[in-house]
Amino acid sequence: MRALLSVSDKEGIVEFGKELENLGFEILSTGGTFKLLKENGVKVIEVSDFTKSPELFEGRVKTLHPKIHGGILHKRNDENHIKQAKENEILGIDLVCVNLYPFKKTTIMSDDFDEIIENIDIGGPAMIRSAAKNYKDVMVLCDRLDYEKVIETLKKNQNDENFRLSLMIKAYEYTANYDAYIANYMNERFNGGFGASKFIVGQKVFDTKYGENPHQKGALYEFDAFFSANFKALKGEASFNNLTDINAALNLASSFDKAPAIAIVKHGNSCGFAIKENLVQSYIHALKSDSVSAYGGVVAINGTLDEALANKINEIYVEVIIAANVDEKALAVFEGKKRIKIFTQESPFLIRSFDKYDFKHIDGGFVYQNSDEADEDELKNAKLMSQREASKEELKDLEIAMKIAAFTKSNNVVYVKNGAMVAIGMGMTSRIDAAKAATFKAKEMGLDLQGCVLASEAFFPFRDSIDEASKVGVKAIVEPGGSIRDDEVVKAADEYGMALYFTGVRHFLH
């Protein structure tokens, strides 16, 4: 038996090589891997000695040789292949262990394009693909986490076709991921991120019980190990719908730096939000916005879920809590609640990945765009359109309302008072309907909107929403502006003594 080991990530390779040697494998290797194995007492043959061909062009050509690829690719049960191998002095290679040059790591650490180009692996992917293609005869490894499993399988003589098939699939996933990153990087560098092809690659974290509905399959995939590093289940398992709601709630609650923010979300839309002096007060005021919709919802906590907050949340049924951190006493509060699910990021405050791009599936393809972000500078740089200026407290509320609006389905309007959302209308086909739905709900919940502020994610096409806002005592408004009737909107704001700001930035969300 013969194995070829050539790795960039050398962790565990010496131990793996020794185990293979003990199992009777002849070891072939290249470059730094060869040197490391030899220094650590592994009997190893350099590939250039095996092929009788030197490494060429500063190591660019090492393993691209018929004796390597022929040794990997020829079928062991095909008489013609065996004959050709013998005629050409090609010896079988039965195990290929390769991981690739660190292209991604290089792009993160350096902008030197020559250095980046040199870290595009050529021989490695070729060997992995060859070994994967001939998986019926050859084992292929590209992940050091598989070393122990492979040794155990070989020792137990369980190296069957199904096991090699699983390694083959993993190998093609690995090379596809590698090439996809290279293509995306080149398009990012030279085509502004929007090249002729776009590759979206994620790693599976776990399967969900089902998808959006019970008849659909579902799973969570991640970019750059984000969930593996920042998502821990403390109680229960996340469903597909839980994950989309967690995403919406976490994005909003984490948008105010270290502020004690609480967001409550149902079906992807905010039904409660507040920033008060502490998390308990934030939760109390967030819940007031719509305690009916909060039932069975998702609560995001930008801080620690402690016993006091847990007791308050436990007064109603919520399905999911996602908190930056959770203490043991808080967990104990929910011991008797079988259906509640609790997740944490094990950090002082909630963490977002801040993905640079966003995409949505449409029938036959997907649309792809730069990610949207409601920055606080939008309000700082907004243009005052009215005669009246907003007070300092109103400006704080406007920032909250503006960010909630940016994370809410269009058309929407958001009312905020004293750091808490007091009304919201979302997902409506007309903005005036959103405004009316919000104030109707607030009245139903017994909330006093007098003195609140208002934000909209897009411009008001008519003055009717301003007229509606005046009925509940809105004092300040922020919106993008850009309507052909902006002058009517400004006039209405002045009539009612409202402060009105145009940001110039729209935040449609569909």
Swiss-Prot record:
<dbReference type="InterPro" id="IPR036914">
    <property type="entry name" value="MGS-like_dom_sf"/>
</dbReference>
<dbReference type="GO" id="GO:0005829">
    <property type="term" value="C:cytosol"/>
</dbReference>
<comment type="similarity">
    <text>Belongs to the PurH family.</text>
</comment>
<comment type="pathway">
    <text>Purine metabolism; IMP biosynthesis via de novo pathway; IMP from 5-formamido-1-(5-phospho-D-ribosyl)imidazole-4-carboxamide: step 1/1.</text>
</comment>
<keyword id="KW-0511">Multifunctional enzyme</keyword>
<dbReference type="Pfam" id="PF02142">
    <property type="entry name" value="MGS"/>
</dbReference>
<keyword id="KW-0808">Transferase</keyword>
<dbReference type="InterPro" id="IPR024051">
    <property type="entry name" value="AICAR_Tfase_dup_dom_sf"/>
</dbReference>
<dbReference type="InterPro" id="IPR016193">
    <property type="entry name" value="Cytidine_deaminase-like"/>
</dbReference>
<dbReference type="GO" id="GO:0006189">
    <property type="term" value="P:'de novo' IMP biosynthetic process"/>
</dbReference>
<feature type="domain" description="MGS-like">
    <location>
        <begin position="1"/>
        <end position="142"/>
    </location>
</feature>
<keyword id="KW-0378">Hydrolase</keyword>
<protein>
    <recommendedName>
        <fullName>Bifunctional purine biosynthesis protein PurH</fullName>
        <ecNumber>2.1.2.3</ecNumber>
        <ecNumber>3.5.4.10</ecNumber>
    </recommendedName>
</protein>
<dbReference type="GO" id="GO:0003937">
    <property type="term" value="F:IMP cyclohydrolase activity"/>
</dbReference>
<dbReference type="Pfam" id="PF01808">
    <property type="entry name" value="AICARFT_IMPCHas"/>
</dbReference>
<dbReference type="InterPro" id="IPR011607">
    <property type="entry name" value="MGS-like_dom"/>
</dbReference>
<dbReference type="GO" id="GO:0004643">
    <property type="term" value="F:phosphoribosylaminoimidazolecarboxamide formyltransferase activity"/>
</dbReference>
<keyword id="KW-0658">Purine biosynthesis</keyword>
<comment type="pathway">
    <text>Purine metabolism; IMP biosynthesis via de novo pathway; 5-formamido-1-(5-phospho-D-ribosyl)imidazole-4-carboxamide from 5-amino-1-(5-phospho-D-ribosyl)imidazole-4-carboxamide (10-formyl THF route): step 1/1.</text>
</comment>
<dbReference type="InterPro" id="IPR002695">
    <property type="entry name" value="PurH-like"/>
</dbReference>
